[in-house]
A protein has these predicted regions:
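N-terminal small-residue-enriched
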Residues: 1-465
Length: 465
């Protein structure tokens, strides 16, 4: 990340945007982006796919009282930004100052700054995984690196410049035993350049963990169905919190009356053990940034404080509409998209309970260590989540692995039923999709005990037979 100044040519556009925002429309801003990326897939003992791409452009927006006007262009030069701004002003039926903007500076990202991923260790890792078990049928290794520069000309005329790098390494292992096929998946992703990324990531460790997950599920029994205590480990990664709670706290969803948390600021919405935060300022986390895509500085936002709803995540439009503070959560998939409120690094703060004591407190039930996909209705809070790795809790201890489990419930009700929160906060990276836009995020949680939750699986008598 950098605080490098983009140059005086952009300041002319800043002066114009500032003058416009103070005379007519509610808000005017310009977003400029330039970036590049590389991706490598290693499969079947060889490099299967290599791709590289570079892209850039500009988006200009005018916020009026009840709607927004937006235009974008693939030209990220100063003159391209000026032309795009003129176009959106024309569409919004606003007059410009008639100034011209000299094209002296470009924020173009130099693709040569991104090193092509070194895949020389991948062959050795592939062989090591296959040699570790006769049941291995497929090994897939993926590595992605990307970098981009952004410039935001804010509504007050100020310029915000930022650089962002992301690196990801993922391993998927498929195993087969007596006709049963299972897959293990493990991923590491941070906001960092490739060199710093590999300083903190061991490819061998990631690969072997993926293999262990796959092999574990080969001997799993069908999951019993019914209501029972559920312990979500830190490794479950906060997926349920992200989906069943986080999206409902994004202000645009709240204002469209699609959220179960609408008009509930100051009310108790969770157990007093629950404090939920969103923090894009965490150094190196996959969902981090110094400024959001509207130029608002990042900061930690406490959304739920000891069970009480304190804040929503906002962008400029939703903050103005609701008369609520800017939280720094205005994000875009690219320059082609309007900013919308999005999560960044969203997690429950750790508690004081030892994870082993949480299992003892549960006594019996389901211990979830890896979550899959699911569906959530933000209006009601109802959810259904797949579980990719879980164990029975038997006499307060981890028991047999189970497969085919689903978690069925209601977000606010589940938050109210949290009876213990561990001291073992764990983060998992991912990509979050909303309104056709995808952005990097991190979800996190410590181990926690939900008093009772409906678990879908098979009939209990079938599992015991």
């Amino acid at each position: 990340m950098s605080a490098e100044h983009p140059g005086t040519a952009w300041e002319h556009i800043g002066e114009k945007v500032s003058a416009l925002s103070g005379n007519g429309p509610d808000y005017v801003d310009v977003f400029v982006q330039s970036g590049a990326g590389h991706s490598v897939t290693f499969e079947k003992g060889r490099i299967e796919e290599v791709s590289s791409a570079a892209s850039g452009g500009v988006g200009a927006r005018v916020l009026l009282e009840d709607h927004s006007v937006f235009s974008h262009s693939p030209d990220c030069s100063v003159s391209g930004a000026a032309d795009c701004l003129e176009k959106v002003l024309s569409r919004a039926r606003l007059s410009s100052s008639g100034k011209t903007f000299p094209c002296k500076v470009s924020i173009s990202f130099d693709p040569t700054r991104l090193k092509v991923p070194d895949v020389s260790p991948f062959g050795q890792l592939d062989k090591a995984i296959r040699a570790s078990s006769p049941f291995v049928r497929q090994v897939t290794l993926r590595h992605r690196v990307s970098g981009k520069r952004i410039l935001v000309v804010r509504g007050d005329g100020n310029l915000v410049f930022d650089e962002r790098f992301h690196s990801l390494f993922a391993v998927q292992v498929t195993v087969e035993k007596e006709g049963t096929i299972q897959t293990g998946y493990e991923v590491r992703a941070f906001q960092s350049e490739a060199g710093a990324f590999w300083d903190r990531v061991s490819p061998t460790q990631v690969g072997m963990q993926a293999l262990e997950r796959a092999l574990l599920m080969l001997d799993a029994i069908p999951c019993p169905a019914g209501r029972m205590p559920v312990v979500l480990s830190g490794e479950a990664g906060g997926t349920m919190i992200h989906e069943a709670c986080g999206h409902g706290l994004e202000a645009d969803i709240v204002q469209k009356d699609f959220s179960v948390y609408r008009d509930r600021l100051g009310e108790k919405v969770a157990s007093p053990l629950v404090t939920l935060v969103d923090d894009p300022s965490i150094e190196g986390a996959y969902g981090s940034y110094t400024y959001d895509d509207e130029g608002t500085p990042s900061r930690m936002n406490v959304l739920i404080d000891r069970g009480v709803l304190k804040a929503y995540m906002t962008d400029v439009q939703s903050a103005r509409k609701g008369g609520i503070p800017l939280s720094g959560n205005g994000r875009r998939g690219s320059y082609r998209n309007l900013p919308i409120p999005r999560m960044s690094n969203t997690f429950l703060l750790p508690g004081k309970d030892n994870p082993a004591s949480i299992l003892e407190k549960a006594g019996r039930g389901l211990f979830v260590t890896k979550m899959g996909g699911g569906q959530v209705n933000p209006t009601s809070g109802d959810f259904v989540f797949q579980v990719t790795e879980a164990f029975l809790i038997e006499n307060g201890r981890v028991g047999r692995p189970v497969r085919g489990a689903t978690l069925i419930g209601n977000g606010p009700e589940a938050l109210m039923k949290i009876e213990a929160v561990g001291d073992d906060l764990h983060f998992e990276p991912g990509m979050c999709g909303k309104d056709g836009q995808s952005v990097p995020v991190t979800d996190g949680q410590p181990s926690l005990l939900i008093r009772d939750l409906l678990v879908g699986g098979c009939d209990i008598s079938d599992a015991e037979s």
